[in-house]
């Protein structure tokens, strides 16, 4: 049987990928997987030491071009542009963006009722999670549109589809990421650029430390499990699109956003 262009799996070898939030958690796990798959990886993070540590780690795993580390703040337009340009300068193309950078709340702030949340915390969360997504997505678009190919994967959350108590600002930011992603996906179809959102449930990453003494839910997802889904998504044939992928632990807590269909009371 003959193979048709666009219907075969997308080979990640020789592709250039920019991963924000690449210094830890899901972003670092994505960097490891993409390096093993043969992609050229730009590890972008706010923390230069973490970005360099992941770059050094994946350099030993890489089967493709040597990875690079980029340091900057996704909230700043100049840094977002520098992330994109730095990837292009190093690899002469930009095929993949995995935008994983994000915050939950102020460090060690702990969950609070909305009237207790400061403007400082609101600005931090919205500017990082939503405005940062806008700025970095916008920065990579010209290169992808010129190539008539590319794939953007934005990290939203299950908190981007159902509101949760004590997480009002975080939920608002992740709802926004989902809306931005869906709108951009419609805009980019004509240019051959895919735009997808991944919505993981609670993940065992340093982000959870921002909840202070409150323990992470049991079970929580391993970051590599989320990274594996992202790698699978990026390897899909060009004529196939997966949208708004919700990732849950198999032995998950009972979902509160779905009502039973058999007439029985919800728990």
Please provide the spans of the model-predicted regions.
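Canonical Rossmann dinucleotide-binding motif of NAD(H)/NADP(H)-dependent dehydrogenases/reductases
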Residues: 9-42
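Substrate-binding pocket helix/loop in short-chain dehydrogenase/reductase
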Residues: 108-114, 118-123
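Alpha-helical segment proximal to the catalytic Tyr-Lys
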Residues: 142, 186-187
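Residue(s) in the substrate-gating loop at a strand-loop-helix junction
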Residues: 157
């Amino acid at each position: 049987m003959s193979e048709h262009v666009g219907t075969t799996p997308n080979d990640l070898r020789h592709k250039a990928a920019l991963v924000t939030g690449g210094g830890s958690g899901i972003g670092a796990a994505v960097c490891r997987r993409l390096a093993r798959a043969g992609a050229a990886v730009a590890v972008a993070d706010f923390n230069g030491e973490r970005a360099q540590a992941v770059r050094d780690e994946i350099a030993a795993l890489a089967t493709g071009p040597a990875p690079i580390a980029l340091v900057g703040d996704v909230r700043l337009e100049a840094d977002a542009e520098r992330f994109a340009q730095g990837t292009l300068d190093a690899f002469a193309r930009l095929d993949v963006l995995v935008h994983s950078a994000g915050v939950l709340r102020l460090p060690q702030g702990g969950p609070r009722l909305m009237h207790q949340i400061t403007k400082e915390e609101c600005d931090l969360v919205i500017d990082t999670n939503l405005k940062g997504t806008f700025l970095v997505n916008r920065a990579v678009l010209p290169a992808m549109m010129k190539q008539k190919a590319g794939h953007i994967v934005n990290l939203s959350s299950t908190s981007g589809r159902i509101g949760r108590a004590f997480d009002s600002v975080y939920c608002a930011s992740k709802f926004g990421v989902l809306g931005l992603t869906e709108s951009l996906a419609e805009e980019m179809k004509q240019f051959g650029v895919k735009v997808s959102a991944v919505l993981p449930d609670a993940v065992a990453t340093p982000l959870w430390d921002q909840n202070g003494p409150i323990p992470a839910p049991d079970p929580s997802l391993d970051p590599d499990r989320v990274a594996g889904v992202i790698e699978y998504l990026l390897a899909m044939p060009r004529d196939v699109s997966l949208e708004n992928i919700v990732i849950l632990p198999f032995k998950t807590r009972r979902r509160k956003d779905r009502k039973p269909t058999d007439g029985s009371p919800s728990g």
